[in-house]
Amino acid sequence: MNKIYYSWQDIEHQCQSIVNSIAREQWRPDYVVGITRGGNIPATIISHMLNVRCEALKIALRDNAECESNCWMAEDAFGYVDDPEYQARWDPDLRKKILVVDDINDTGETLNWLIRDWQSACLPQEEYAWNTVWGNTVKFASLVDN
């Protein structure tokens, strides 16, 4: 497979395209999550363009490396309520909008891992509610789709 090299201007242009796309949808994330390693740079650029904070999440499936599970991100996405007074244990009004960014989407396995991880970490029995999270509260973006 031939490698394709991108200039800094190419990367900035692709990040601006992502920002323009979510602006057209009138959707604004509360924060951006960069998938380490390759997603950190575009996530940081996008977070600066949107003036929102940026977080990192380690998912390295390719090299049999360990992945980190960030339960608090799943709780943000779901609107989890850690209060016994709340019967439902989640509140859609508390959901944070999260843009997850990676550099390359080859097979979709990284994003599938993230979906499985977050759903298993936070109220996994609420599958219907989780289905409203993906694509609404949590959106995914990559610079390159193979």
Model-derived regions, located:
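PRPP-associated nucleotide enzymes
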Residues: M1-N146
